[in-house]
């Protein structure tokens, strides 16, 4: 199977049969598990997060709670005790951020609400924590972010992030 974007899988293990997911130039091989893959083209990394069971990326076996991140240069880093709730928040109808920069926040908002985001003076260095329902209107999301110190101008479907 090949994906673009993000997907969540629950796979039952079958002897002598492997379930493989290709995302960009990487392949995740399932060994009977539940896992999330985030591989949007605009993200700097492909992230595979294990909810339960095990998967194999390259020659590394990942276990529940692990997250493998492969950057655009092909370097892989494995994080143990990953924030599974954050990784699968999208499938539970939420945006969840834990020390996320504005670019991380705005990439998700841009995809969900189909808006174009720009940073004419560069992205602010502020970090964001919290969860926002994906059922909130775009105006509601910006109101929440502005209460956290973010500044924007909005013209139609174009959002300009200000310092």
Which residues make up each language-model segment?
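A residue-level detector for the "anchor" residue at the start of short, highly conserved motifs
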Residues: 1-163
